[in-house]
């Protein structure tokens, strides 16, 4: 099995969502997890201990394993992410331009039929999930 398959099969059973992962050229495997209510240090330790054992059994080659929350500016990858974070601001970069524009910063209005609706500058744009290159939440800080 590959790393993604192992993570997708293992993490939900532990009560966590796989947000993203990366394997660096130096051999560091970073796994970003989330759950309702957020991630604690204990959650990271639990997942790290469990995955270390699973990766040993599956003979996955890595040097260091890092488990982390996705942070306030978490990536948005799946339709469920855009549904969950409707009403929040995001920065979205598309693969192909929409009306001559590839970068959008605005409020996520929702996601239906694999199409994300975003409002910005008094306009609304619909972006197909397949056209999204990168998307991240843009947290607002009010002082």
UniProtKB/Swiss-Prot annotation:
SUPFAM superfamilies: YhbC-like, C-terminal domain, YhbC-like, N-terminal domain. InterPro entries: Ribosome_maturation_RimP (IPR003728), RimP_C (IPR028998), RimP_C_sf (IPR036847), RimP_N (IPR028989), RimP_N_sf (IPR035956). The keyword Cytoplasm applies. Gene3D superfamilies: Ribosome maturation factor RimP, C-terminal domain, RimP-like superfamily, N-terminal. CDD domains: YlxS_C (cd01734). Keywords: Cytoplasm, Ribosome biogenesis. GO terms for biological process: ribosomal small subunit assembly; translation. It is found in: Cytoplasm. One of its GO terms (cellular component) is cytosol. It holds the Pfam family RimP_N. Its main location: cytoplasm. Belongs to the RimP family. Required for maturation of 30S ribosomal subunits. This is Ribosome maturation factor RimP. The gene is rimP.
């Amino acid at each position: 099995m590959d790393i993604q398959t192992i993570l997708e099969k293992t993490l939900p059973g532990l009560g966590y969502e796989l947000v993203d992962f990366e394997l660096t050229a130096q051999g560091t495997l970073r796994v970003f997890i989330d759950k309702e209510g957020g991630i604690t240090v204990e959650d990271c330790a639990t997942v790290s201990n469990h995955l270390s054992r699973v990766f040993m059994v599956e003979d996955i080659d890595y040097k260091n394993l890092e488990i982390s929350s996705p942070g306030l500016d978490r990536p948005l990858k799946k339709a469920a992410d855009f549904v969950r974070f409707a009403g929040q601001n995001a920065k979205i970069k598309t693969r192909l331009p929409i009306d001559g524009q590839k970068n959008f910063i605005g409020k996520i209005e929702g996601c239906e039929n694999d199409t994300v609706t975003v409002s910005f500058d008094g306009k609304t744009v619909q972006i197909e999930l397949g056209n999204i290159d990168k998307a991240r939440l843009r947290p607002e800080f009010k002082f």
